[in-house]
Design a protein with these regions (language model features):
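Intrinsic-disorder-associated, low-complexity terminal segments enriched in Asp/Asn/His/Tyr and depleted
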Residues: 3-6
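C-terminal binding/interaction regions
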Residues: 8-49, 102-187
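Short acidic-glycine loop/turn motifs at beta-strand connectors
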Residues: 65-68, 141-143
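Compact, glycine-rich, soluble single-domain proteins
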Residues: 74-89
């Protein structure tokens, strides 16, 4: 039996996107607001700081918290599993600098890819927890293609601890008491 390569006809892609609730790729950024264009520009600058010595795939992100923009870039590790994505770097930087309390309003992400780059599953989960299902995600590539979606479109049914059954949530939130043997975390 011969292996066959299958391709998807480009004419089917818009229908597939429509079925999944994604907006079509814009050929340019003219449909973005001035605030969104500023966020994309900031993400482009952040991309230049990426440390992608393993993959050479540099990604930049810019997150809007109130009136402030927090930058993030991917930082790769020789132990590839320890690599941190641009989107999570931006979110974690916002927490480290105390800006996260202003609330995540939107995020832009950009890479040199054939299609606008989309956050990975781990980033989608973190963004869902930080910005909620209505968070606006602006996905771009360096060619100027843009796709805009909400987190609910990218991560339907996103997980939050508060959505777990009350008994389980209480058990998770309840700290363990110290015993005579030692502190709560002792074996």
């Amino acid at each position: 039996m011969r292996n066959r390569a299958y391709t998807i006809s480009p004419s089917l892609i818009p229908n597939e996107m429509k079925r999944n609730g994604l907006k079509p790729i814009e050929a340019n950024q003219t449909r973005l607001t001035a605030d969104e264009r500023a966020l994309v520009t900031a993400a482009k600058k952040a991309r230049l700081r990426a440390h992608a010595h393993q993959s050479q795939f540099k990604v930049g992100a810019a997150a809007r918290y109130g009136n402030e923009i927090v930058l993030g870039c991917n930082v790769e590790s020789d132990s590839y599993g320890l690599t941190n994505c641009a989107e999570r770097t931006a979110v974690f930087s916002a927490h480290a600098s105390g800006i996260a309390r202003k609330g995540l309003r939107m995020i832009a992400v950009i890479a040199d890819s054939p299609e606008p780059v989309s956050p990975c599953g781990a980033c989608r989960q973190v963004l869902f927890e930080q910005g909620g299902p209505d968070l606006r995600v602006i996905m771009c590539n360096t060619r100027g293609d843009v796709r805009v979606a909400t987190l609910a479109e990218l991560l339907p049914g996103g997980f939050r601890l508060e959505t777990t059954p009350p008994r389980r949530a209480a058990a998770v939130a309840k700290p363990r008491k110290a015993t005579k043997r030692g502190p709560a975390d002792a074996p």
